[in-house]
Amino acid sequence: DPPNPLTPYATSKACMELLGNQFRNANGLHVVFVRPFYFTGPHHSRRFVIPSIAYQLVKIKYYGAEPIIYSGSLDVSRDIIDVRDVARGMIQILNQADSGEVFNLCCGKSYTIREVVEMMVDIANVSVDFRFDPGYERRNEIPLLIGDPTKAMDIGWKPMISMEDSLTDLFNEMVKRR
Protein backbone atom coordinates (compact mmCIF):
# COMPACT_ATOMS: atom_id res chain seq x y z
CA ASP A 1 0.00 0.00 0.00
CA PRO A 2 1.23 3.52 -0.67
CA PRO A 3 2.14 5.58 2.39
CA ASN A 4 -0.61 7.62 4.00
CA PRO A 5 1.28 9.94 6.37
CA LEU A 6 -0.79 11.37 9.19
CA THR A 7 1.63 13.99 10.53
CA PRO A 8 4.00 16.56 9.03
CA TYR A 9 6.95 14.46 10.24
CA ALA A 10 5.61 11.34 8.52
CA THR A 11 4.93 13.38 5.37
CA SER A 12 8.56 14.53 5.33
CA LYS A 13 9.70 10.89 5.48
CA ALA A 14 7.35 9.88 2.65
CA CYS A 15 8.72 12.76 0.56
CA MET A 16 12.27 11.54 1.18
CA GLU A 17 11.29 8.12 -0.14
CA LEU A 18 9.86 9.73 -3.28
CA LEU A 19 13.04 11.75 -3.72
CA GLY A 20 15.19 8.68 -3.13
CA ASN A 21 13.27 6.80 -5.81
CA GLN A 22 13.74 9.67 -8.26
CA PHE A 23 17.51 9.61 -7.71
CA ARG A 24 17.52 5.82 -7.97
CA ASN A 25 15.60 5.85 -11.24
CA ALA A 26 17.42 8.81 -12.80
CA ASN A 27 20.96 7.82 -11.83
CA GLY A 28 20.89 4.06 -11.33
CA LEU A 29 21.84 4.42 -7.67
CA HIS A 30 21.45 1.58 -5.17
CA VAL A 31 18.88 3.06 -2.81
CA VAL A 32 17.06 1.18 -0.08
CA PHE A 33 14.61 2.63 2.38
CA VAL A 34 14.67 1.96 6.09
CA ARG A 35 11.85 3.04 8.34
CA PRO A 36 13.16 2.86 11.88
CA PHE A 37 10.43 3.16 14.44
CA TYR A 38 11.00 4.96 17.74
CA PHE A 39 14.45 4.01 18.96
CA THR A 40 16.35 4.71 22.13
CA GLY A 41 19.47 3.65 23.96
CA PRO A 42 22.73 5.13 25.21
CA HIS A 43 23.55 8.69 24.08
CA HIS A 44 19.95 9.46 23.08
CA SER A 45 19.22 13.20 23.26
CA ARG A 46 17.21 14.41 26.25
CA ARG A 47 14.89 16.21 23.83
CA PHE A 48 13.03 12.92 23.40
CA VAL A 49 10.59 11.43 25.89
CA ILE A 50 12.47 8.33 27.08
CA PRO A 51 15.86 9.99 27.67
CA SER A 52 14.07 12.99 29.19
CA ILE A 53 12.50 10.68 31.73
CA ALA A 54 15.83 8.91 32.32
CA TYR A 55 17.46 12.30 32.97
CA GLN A 56 14.71 13.27 35.40
CA LEU A 57 15.28 9.99 37.25
CA VAL A 58 19.03 10.65 37.42
CA LYS A 59 18.32 14.08 38.94
CA ILE A 60 15.95 12.52 41.46
CA LYS A 61 18.30 9.69 42.44
CA TYR A 62 21.64 11.54 42.48
CA TYR A 63 20.81 15.22 43.02
CA GLY A 64 17.84 15.12 45.35
CA ALA A 65 15.40 16.58 42.83
CA GLU A 66 11.75 16.48 43.76
CA PRO A 67 10.52 12.92 43.04
CA ILE A 68 8.10 13.92 40.30
CA ILE A 69 8.28 12.85 36.66
CA TYR A 70 6.88 15.41 34.24
CA SER A 71 5.67 14.15 30.88
CA GLY A 72 2.95 14.34 28.29
CA SER A 73 0.43 11.54 27.94
CA LEU A 74 1.64 8.26 29.40
CA ASP A 75 -0.98 6.32 27.48
CA VAL A 76 0.37 6.62 23.93
CA SER A 77 1.90 3.38 22.64
CA ARG A 78 5.02 3.09 20.53
CA ASP A 79 6.98 0.30 18.90
CA ILE A 80 10.33 0.96 20.57
CA ILE A 81 13.65 -0.56 19.56
CA ASP A 82 17.24 -0.13 20.67
CA VAL A 83 19.38 2.19 18.53
CA ARG A 84 22.10 -0.48 18.30
CA ASP A 85 19.61 -2.88 16.72
CA VAL A 86 18.66 -0.12 14.27
CA ALA A 87 22.30 0.50 13.33
CA ARG A 88 22.94 -3.21 12.84
CA GLY A 89 19.75 -3.50 10.78
CA MET A 90 20.69 -0.59 8.53
CA ILE A 91 24.06 -2.15 7.74
CA GLN A 92 22.51 -5.55 7.07
CA ILE A 93 19.80 -4.08 4.84
CA LEU A 94 22.27 -1.96 2.90
CA ASN A 95 24.41 -5.03 2.24
CA GLN A 96 21.59 -7.45 1.41
CA ALA A 97 18.60 -5.59 0.01
CA ASP A 98 17.77 -4.94 -3.61
CA SER A 99 17.54 -1.34 -4.71
CA GLY A 100 14.12 0.19 -4.09
CA GLU A 101 13.14 -2.12 -1.25
CA VAL A 102 11.53 -0.75 1.91
CA PHE A 103 12.13 -2.18 5.39
CA ASN A 104 10.69 -1.44 8.81
CA LEU A 105 13.11 -1.66 11.72
CA CYS A 106 10.92 -2.27 14.73
CA CYS A 107 10.10 -5.02 17.17
CA GLY A 108 6.44 -5.49 16.26
CA LYS A 109 5.32 -4.85 19.85
CA SER A 110 4.09 -1.65 21.39
CA TYR A 111 4.81 -0.24 24.83
CA THR A 112 2.89 2.56 26.47
CA ILE A 113 5.02 5.39 27.74
CA ARG A 114 3.63 4.48 31.18
CA GLU A 115 5.11 0.95 30.86
CA VAL A 116 8.47 2.39 29.82
CA VAL A 117 8.46 4.87 32.71
CA GLU A 118 7.60 2.10 35.18
CA MET A 119 10.50 -0.01 33.87
CA MET A 120 12.85 2.96 34.22
CA VAL A 121 11.64 3.73 37.74
CA ASP A 122 12.45 0.12 38.65
CA ILE A 123 15.90 0.45 37.03
CA ALA A 124 16.58 3.68 38.94
CA ASN A 125 15.19 2.16 42.14
CA VAL A 126 13.34 5.31 43.17
CA SER A 127 9.76 6.19 44.06
CA VAL A 128 8.13 8.95 42.03
CA ASP A 129 4.84 10.61 41.27
CA PHE A 130 3.77 11.55 37.77
CA ARG A 131 2.60 14.97 36.64
CA PHE A 132 1.15 15.80 33.29
CA ASP A 133 2.97 18.70 31.65
CA PRO A 134 1.22 20.13 28.57
CA GLY A 135 4.63 21.30 27.34
CA TYR A 136 5.41 17.65 26.55
CA GLU A 137 2.10 17.04 24.78
CA ARG A 138 2.07 16.85 20.99
CA ARG A 139 -0.80 18.14 18.95
CA ASN A 140 -2.46 15.42 16.88
CA GLU A 141 -0.65 12.70 18.85
CA ILE A 142 -1.20 9.30 17.28
CA PRO A 143 -2.25 6.98 20.12
CA LEU A 144 -0.71 3.77 18.74
CA LEU A 145 2.25 3.20 16.41
CA ILE A 146 3.37 -0.35 15.78
CA GLY A 147 5.37 -1.76 12.91
CA ASP A 148 5.77 -5.03 11.08
CA PRO A 149 9.41 -6.20 11.03
CA THR A 150 8.71 -9.31 8.91
CA LYS A 151 10.58 -8.16 5.80
CA ALA A 152 13.71 -7.25 7.77
CA MET A 153 13.50 -10.56 9.62
CA ASP A 154 13.22 -12.37 6.27
CA ILE A 155 16.80 -11.28 5.48
CA GLY A 156 18.03 -12.49 8.87
CA TRP A 157 17.79 -9.35 11.01
CA LYS A 158 16.01 -9.31 14.32
CA PRO A 159 16.07 -7.05 17.36
CA MET A 160 18.45 -8.52 19.91
CA ILE A 161 18.54 -5.99 22.75
CA SER A 162 15.60 -6.24 25.14
CA MET A 163 13.67 -3.19 26.23
CA GLU A 164 14.91 -3.66 29.78
CA ASP A 165 18.55 -3.82 28.66
CA SER A 166 18.13 -0.80 26.40
CA LEU A 167 16.59 1.26 29.20
CA THR A 168 19.21 0.10 31.70
CA ASP A 169 22.02 1.06 29.33
CA LEU A 170 20.38 4.44 28.68
CA PHE A 171 19.99 5.13 32.40
CA ASN A 172 23.56 4.07 33.20
CA GLU A 173 24.92 6.23 30.39
CA MET A 174 22.87 9.18 31.71
CA VAL A 175 24.41 8.61 35.15
CA LYS A 176 27.90 8.80 33.61
CA ARG A 177 26.93 11.89 31.59
CA ARG A 178 25.60 13.73 34.65
Where are these regions (language model features)?
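Heptad-repeat alpha-helical coiled-coil signaling segments
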Residues: Y38, H44, D75-R78
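Short beta-loop-alpha junction of Rossmann-like oxidoreductase domains
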Residues: P42-H44, F48, K151
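Alpha-helical segments that scaffold the active site and NAD(P)H-binding pocket
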Residues: N21-N25, A54-Y55, N95
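Catalytic helix-loop patch of NAD(P)-dependent Rossmann-fold dehydrogenases
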Residues: D1-F33, T40, H44
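Short, hinge-like loop/turn segments at secondary-structure boundaries
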Residues: I50-S52, G147
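Conserved sequence/active-site signature of Rossmann-fold short-chain dehydrogenase/reductase
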Residues: V32, F39-T40, V49, V86
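C-terminal substrate-binding subdomain of Rossmann-fold SDR/epimerase-dehydratase oxidoreductases
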Residues: L57-R178
